[in-house]
């Protein structure tokens, strides 16, 4: 057992942690501390408030936590007025948008918890020094924040991209007064406008989330120099960091800002998402005034955009994600999973050619994304909520009668079972159940046995008693990239705690990939049996998966943990191949 020393030294940390986390008194007092990661749908098929109301039940079947939507008002003359072109000098009235508010209030949401009203930087034809024009732009932001607040939306989705050329709100080169004012003068004015905008936003909606397709991530190349303005002056979004700085001047701590990092459209590795998150959290602070950097660190979230078309487009397209030897839709799953792991809260999914739900847009094809790219919804479902995905897949397999666990003697009913290499192993009196081994720390004097009369249904269970720190173990041959659902039942009597841990070994049996260990704790239940359930993915260097049924904190013979119905299932074969 010498080769296990480092591994079990690490386990001791988990044993102590497990005892704290599963103590009943703490469970009774602690709120749900998990950070829920969310997928937000946007793209050419985004709904307006009326279509959302009409199609909500169908839309909430898709794997999203919210949508970007358009609010359209009606003027006194009966003309439509969208909130999106907010950077204009047109005068708006908030009552024009009351119908949109009413339609959103009428929606009975069951899944879409985080919806965002779309707002854009177009037409962008108002000079930053135009006080009268900016009075209207600021009022547009106020109205948009009012619509979001009154309708129960999470906040606003701001798209800074210019679509009304030659105008470009954040480009110094596009400003009408560039011959009269230097870049620094324009930047100072943009910061002032940012303060004005944020002030009215929080007056209407003090707890708003301002979700941007991108913030300073678009200007990251300007960092690393004493004066970023020298580089920003030549960039298409060079004035945008100044406006963001203005937001930060007056933003209260109740507001969340999201850098959506649209540049992630072509990311195709976990490392790219992690490095981008570090840039947003790290060097992008250099584009913020020193006095605002604490606010930036506390209130700006990292997010990422997933461009669905890049997983469908032909290879010659500049917007193309390679399958790296496998189905491209599998890369969608892998990359969305990586994006959610690196993001603070949100990942947004953007599509153009196809649709998730009905849309009148003529430039969106009639086929759904599921039809155009089979397996894409399954990929997003898994990335968003692996446990929910596993429960559904296992339930379907169980109903079909083809659910077979890979665990040997997982129900603890057998006198003999095979080892990982197929050798017969018979149970020995006083030892762990057949097919299982056990380990405990050198100062632990407990017992690991087979209780033939215990268990969920009384057919047998693994029993650990008076164990200070230890575990039952069983290992399996696996391959990198495979995904598994693992579950067990446990019952704790007296002092102590229990959990299920998945560890990794090389094909030669050496422990590896320790940061990718996974530990699963059960929730208390009425019948004293709690379920331990989790989903894992085999890391590159691993050839074996090890299930550890961990126990700690026992001191007396009456301190007992029983484990039963340990199961391991491989989740789905690789997703179907996508078009071209």
Description of each model-found segment:
Residues 25-27:
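Sec/Tat signal peptide C-region and signal peptidase I cleavage site
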Residues 1-10:
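N-terminal secretory signal peptides that target proteins for export/translocation
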Residues 12-23:
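Bacterial N-terminal signal peptides
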Residues 397-580:
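Extracellular and organelle-lumenal recognition/adhesion modules and their flexible linkers in secreted
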Residues 29-400:
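Glycan-processing catalytic domains of CAZymes
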């Amino acid at each position: 057992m010498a080769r296990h020393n480092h591994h079990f030294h690490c386990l001791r940390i988990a044993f102590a942690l497990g005892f704290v986390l599963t103590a009943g008194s703490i469970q009774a007092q602690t709120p749900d501390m998990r950070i829920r990661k969310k997928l937000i749908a946007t793209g050419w098929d985004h709904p307006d408030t009326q279509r959302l109301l009409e199609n909500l039940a169908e839309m909430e079947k898709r794997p999203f936590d919210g949508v970007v939507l358009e609010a359209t008002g009606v003027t006194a003359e009966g003309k439509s007025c969208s909130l999106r072109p907010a950077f204009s000098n047109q005068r708006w009235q908030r009552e024009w948008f009351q119908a949109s508010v009413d339609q959103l209030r009428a929606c009975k949401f069951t899944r879409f918890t985080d919806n965002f009203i779309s707002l854009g930087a177009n037409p962008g034809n108002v000079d930053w020094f135009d006080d009268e024009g900016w009075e209207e732009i600021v009022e547009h932001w106020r109205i948009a924040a009012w619509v979001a607040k009154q309708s129960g939306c999470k906040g606003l989705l701001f798209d800074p991209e210019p679509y009304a050329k030659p105008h470009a709100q954040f480009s110094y080169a596009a400003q009408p007064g560039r011959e009269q004012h230097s870049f620094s003068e324009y930047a100072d004015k943009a910061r002032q406008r940012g303060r004005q905008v944020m002030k009215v936003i929080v007056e209407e909606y003090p707890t708003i989330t301002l979700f941007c397709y991108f913030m300073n991530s678009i200007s990251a190349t300007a960092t690393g120099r004493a004066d970023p303005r020298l580089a920003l002056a030549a960039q298409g979004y060079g004035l945008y960091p100044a406006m963001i700085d203005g937001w930060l001047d007056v933003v209260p701590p109740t507001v969340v800002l999201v850098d959506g990092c649209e540049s992630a459209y072509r990311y195709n590795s976990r490392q790219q998402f992690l490095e981008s998150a570090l840039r947003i959290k790290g060097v992008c602070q250099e584009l913020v005034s020193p006095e605002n950097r604490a606010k930036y660190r506390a209130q700006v979230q990292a997010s990422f955009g997933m461009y669905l078309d890049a997983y469908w487009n032909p290879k010659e397209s500049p917007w193309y994600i390679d399958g790296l030897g496998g189905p491209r839709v599998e890369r969608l799953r892998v990359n969305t999973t990586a994006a959610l792991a690196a993001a603070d809260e949100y990942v947004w999914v953007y599509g153009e050619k196809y649709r998730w739900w009905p849309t009148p847009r003529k430039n969106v094809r009639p086929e759904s994304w599921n039809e155009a790219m089979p397996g894409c919804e399954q990929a997003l479902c898994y990335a968003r909520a692996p446990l929910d995905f596993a429960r559904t897949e296992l339930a379907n397999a169980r109903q079909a009668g083809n659910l077979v666990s890979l665990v040997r003697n997982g129900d603890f009913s057998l006198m003999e079972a095979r080892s990982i290499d197929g050798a017969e192993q018979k149970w020995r009196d006083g030892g762990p159940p057949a097919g299982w081994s056990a380990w405990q720390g050198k100062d632990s004097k407990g017992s690991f046995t087979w209780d033939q009369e215990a268990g969920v249904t009384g057919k047998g269970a693994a029993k650990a008693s008076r164990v200070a720190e230890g575990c039952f173990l069983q290992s399996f041959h696996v391959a990198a990239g495979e995904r598994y659902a693992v579950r067990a039942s446990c019952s704790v009597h007296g002092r102590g705690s229990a959990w299920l841990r998945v560890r990794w070994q090389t094909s030669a049996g050496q422990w590896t990939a320790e940061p990718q260990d996974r530990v699963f704790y059960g929730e208390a239940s009425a019948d004293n049996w709690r379920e331990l359930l989790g989903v894992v993915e085999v890391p590159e260097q691993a050839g074996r998966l090890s299930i550890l049924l961990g126990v700690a904190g026992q001191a007396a013979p009456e301190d007992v943990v029983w484990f039963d119905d340990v199961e391991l299932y491989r989740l789905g074969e690789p997703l179907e191949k996508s078009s071209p």
